[in-house]
Regions:
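Extreme N-terminal leader/targeting segments of oxidoreductases
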Residues: 1-18, 36
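N-terminal Rossmann-like FAD-binding beta1-loop-alpha1 element of flavoenzymes
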Residues: 16-43
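Flavin-dependent oxidoreductases
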Residues: 29, 190-196, 202-284, 288-297, ...
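Glycine-rich FAD pyrophosphate-binding loop
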Residues: 36-56
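Dinucleotide-binding Rossmann-like beta1-alpha1 core, especially the glycine-rich loop
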Residues: 60-141, 270-271
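Short beta-strand to alpha-helix junction loop
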Residues: 74-79, 107-113, 153-172, 295-301, ...
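Helical element adjacent to the flavin cofactor pocket in flavoenzyme catalytic cores
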Residues: 154-211
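C-terminal catalytic lobe of FAD-dependent flavoproteins
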Residues: 268, 294-421, 428-441, 457
Length: 504
């Protein structure tokens, strides 16, 4: 485990009702849901920002649950979570598109099995609006899909969201409602006596929580081991995606892949093409077993294989349109299902583990159940009341690129910084960057700003705007420019001034 460089006593002696370990989509959504009660909630995340691992390194698809077996926790929570997405994203002011999913079939011999499969998904598994559509209908909706597709299984409930944007929004709303998010805070060990966690040692002091929620992703098994309650193992699985330039977005408006109904491996998800919430196309991911929990290196073979496979979905796909690529590490158990339950040996522990795809989709529903479980556990020691002042609404930074000329002019007259263009590719203004740095959960790094308002997400990948973003961070925070980091750790952009320090 890569640990933060910070060593201090900022959290020494803290006694929260609930300590949430992990700042991914699971931990952040649970923290927000917990604030519906009058509870002291502390979320500890070892990285310099939330959504730094799997929650910031996935394709952003909101799954309808077509491919999940009945009776699993995954299937139960994906159905419930999918239905909650419209309301959640509206409350948190996060872009969300319910664009539909197409699974194309190449052989007429699979038509009857496809009909039976769609009916089984719809009527037995509760995956609403699952049906078979003709090739003619498919090409009318998505004209660039492979003309060899004879028909497709379609579901209208699939959607696309920005995964790190939603995680940040969850965390910000939790903070707005009174939660504390401690970044650069790693759990090192636990003091467990008589089947109860008495204290949790971090690099920032010892914490004394009433209960602990383990939402630590690939490290959930390590936290469980510290708590003396490990009954599952995580076997990390890498997945690589490529992001295409927005000009390629015209190739498809929804989510698509091609499949065969022949039985394949038990790996979750087989990759596809996603029209993202920000109008790029995303190609992938693949699924490769690994023993390294934090190896986010991207292999050329993964990109090649993803494109080779998905050119069966859209023949016009071209690697020349790639603007960047990334790899995430999933956290499956060997049972390939979620672990959402109270500790079996440790009384004041809740596990939220084994969260792999479709964990982004399931997060709202999982958070609701875990928060109720936690509130009930805390109520054993003292009364827990509803938080009457809870506010579910979070207003994001105004998105200049989505405004009409009239709306832009009105905003610029009120806030001149919104008239200073910093990122040309994504049309991001100085005002948006300043507001991101003044948000409920500000992160004063170039990547922190990038994840919040998208400078550097376009074709040039920050080649033009990165120095300007760094200057704005320096200006807003008052720190020297050479102290500004790209991300966490020692990722400094500069090493000092030139010409004897006068900067000229």
């Amino acid at each position: 485990m890569k640990l933060p460089h910070i060593q201090d006593q900022a959290l020494e002696g803290r006694k929260p009702d609930v300590l949430v370990i992990g700042g991914g989509i699971s931990g952040a959504s649970i923290a927000r849901e917990l604030m519906k009660w009058k509870l002291d909630v502390l979320l500890a995340e070892k990285e310099s920002d939330v959504a730094m691992h799997a929650s910031g390194r996935n394709d952003g698809e909101v799954h309808p649950g077509i491919d999940l077996g009945k009776g699993t926790l995954k299937q139960h929570y994906v159905i419930a979570g999918n239905r909650m997405y419209g309301k959640i994203c509206k409350e948190l002011d996060v872009p969300f598109k319910r664009c539909g999913q197409y699974v194309g079939m190449m052989h007429w011999s699979e038509l009857l099995p496809a009909y039976l499969y769609a009916c089984q998904r719809k009527y037995m598994c509760g995956v609403s609006d699952t049906r078979v559509i003709s090739g003619k209908t498919l090409r009318k909706r998505e004209p660039h899909l492979n003309p060899d597709m004879k028909f497709a299984i379609y579901n209208s409930m699939a959607g696309s969201v920005c995964p790190y944007g939603l995680t940040i929004a969850y965390a910000e709303n939790a903070v707005q409602n009174g939660a504390e998010v401690a970044l650069n805070t790693a759990v090192l060990s636990m003091d467990v006596k008589d089947g109860k966690i008495r204290s949790v040692l971090t690099n920032r002091g010892r914490i004394y929580p009433e209960i602990v929620i383990n939402a630590a992703g690939v490290f959930a098994e390590d936290v469980a081991e510290m708590a003396g309650d490990r009954f599952y193992s995580i076997h990390p699985r890498r997945g690589t995606n490529a992001i295409l330039d927005k000009k390629a977005g015209k190739l498809m408006g929804g989510i698509a892949s091609w499949k065969t109904l022949k039985k394949t491996s038990g790996h979750t998800k087989g990759g596809g093409i996603v029209h993202t919430a920000h109008d790029n196309l995303l190609v992938g991911p693949d699924a490769v077993e690994t023993y390294e929990k934090e190896n986010f290196a991207t292999q050329a073979s993964s990109i090649e294989n993803n494109f080779k496979k998905q050119q069966g979905t859209v023949k016009e796909l071209s690697q020349r349109d790639i603007i960047t690529y990334f790899t995430g590490v999933r956290a499956p158990t060997f049972e390939e299902d979620f672990v959402i339950e109270r500790g079996r040996k440790t009384k004041n522990l809740i596990h939220c583990a084994g969260i792999q795809s479709p964990g982004l989709t399931t997060a709202p529903a999982v958070a609701k159940d875990v928060a109720k479980m936690a509130a009930k556990m805390v109520s054993v020691s003292h009364p827990v009341k509803k938080n009457e002042s809870y506010n579910p609404y979070r207003k994001g930074v105004p998105r200049l690129r989505e405004m009409s000329p009239e709306q832009r002019n009105k905003l610029i007259q009120k806030r001149p910084d919104y008239g200073v263009m910093i990122c040309r590719c994504e049309e991001i203004s100085k005002g948006e960057i300043v507001d991101a740095l003044c948000s409920p959960l500000p992160v004063y790094t170039v990547d922190g700003v990038k994840k919040r308002v998208r400078p550097g997400m376009g074709r040039c990948q920050g080649g033009f705007c990165m120095p300007l973003v760094a200057e704005i961070i320096s200006e807003v925070t008052g720190q020297p420019l050479e102290n500004v980091k790209k991300s966490g750790g020692d990722s400094y952009l500069l090493f000092g001034k030139t010409k004897a320090g006068d900067g000229k």
